[in-house]
Amino acid sequence: MNKKLKNNLEKKIRVIPNFPKKGIQFQDITSITDSKQLFTEVVNEISKYCKKNKFTKVAGIEARGFIFGSAVAYKLGLPFIPIRKKGKLPGKIVKQKYKLEYGMDEIQIHKHSITFRDKVLIVDDLIATGGTASAAAKLISKLGVKKIEFFMIIDLWNLKGSKKISKSYQIRSLM
């Protein structure tokens, strides 16, 4: 990994305690998108990995995964697949339910957007407990995809999400 980029990210990303609720340490990634240089470096780093590993599609988890995933897809001339929250996509969809701290949620993609031949890189801003990431991989697997990997900006390693995901999928992060 790019140590200079990691150091720059660690300096720039603001941590907001108790937002949006008590006990959460919110990682504010707008300091990345506010900086042309830092945003470009992040997109370039993910793009380099994506190109090297010959992914055919880039998926992004709603909402902040859209920011980085779509930029990577654009840079490489690849299709971008939005992984949306329940009720946000018209037409034929594939869905996956997953557990939240209090209850259940669901994510969806268009059924026609991915085929079994695709190699999909899932991009998001961070991984915490791994629940949403795991659901995203299961969702894409339902379409027969064999190569699925993750690239996150931030790994909140103390919440063990990356450890959970790495049992089944390759996962990379910038910090």
Predicted regions and their residues:
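Short Gly/Thr/Asp-enriched flexible loops that form oxyanion-binding sites at enzyme active sites
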Residues: I67-L76
